[in-house]
Amino acid sequence: MQSDKSKALIDSITLSINNLATMTDATVKSALFKDWLRAVSRFHHYSFNNQLLVLLQRPQAERVAGFHTWKSLGRNVKKGAKGIAILAPCVRKQTVEEADILRTGERGSAMRLCGFRVTHVFDIADTEGKPLPELEHRAQAGGDSLLPRLERAAAAMGIVMEYREVTGSKNGWSEGGKVVVNATLSTPAKCGTLAHELAHEYLHWQSNRRDDMTREQRELEAEATSFAVLAHFGVEQPSDRYLASWDATAESITASLHTIRDAVHHILGVMDSECQAETEIEEIAA
């Protein structure tokens, strides 16, 4: 059973998507889309709906967590701080009959989603206590160390990397299992190009979606994904293409936003895993 509070939150999400779809001001539309991408970059572990809810209520939020999670990290929520309302799933055990597994001869029970409840998280600005080393590390990762991390992520995704001097205006391209980046680019430009092409590989080659999409839609998804991946490390690309010229319905926008969110979560997850493995190797060597 859905509560009135959770229904109100879901309605606010639907309204924000509809507003984006019907917006005619290209500049404002692009700015709103980039705001959402920044939210994805900060909260990529959160669901699509909760990312939007955090953005709608606290656009400047940097890192959010529940009251007890902050306490476990050595930080306390400040007195009088206002929480950010998000949705948490309500689950219960279902019977064998409900799961319709009697015919298979199996026994036991499974979990069933029976709705959502409203819970609250707090931004780091609403807390005080021990500093978080992870945020300091993330801030440092935006320099020259970002490119090697992207390269290791490519290898972990099974993608062959090649730097090649390219004539003309192309910065790079993906070939389905291989990415070529213009060797004459600056390090920041290499980062942007590599992140963009990794997005193409994951979104369009590895998923076999490439032939079912227009070139414009493929470029939109790849550019948006790379923007969010780099923004996670404090690097922003100077691009305003995004949704500004994208004529789409609320349904198609929602589908693409879900896809972009999943791609960002996957690529950042690979980068985090590779960074952790690298740290463990350094500790062993020391």
Describe these PLM feature segments.
Residues 1-286:
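N-terminal accessory/interface modules of nucleic-acid-binding and processing proteins
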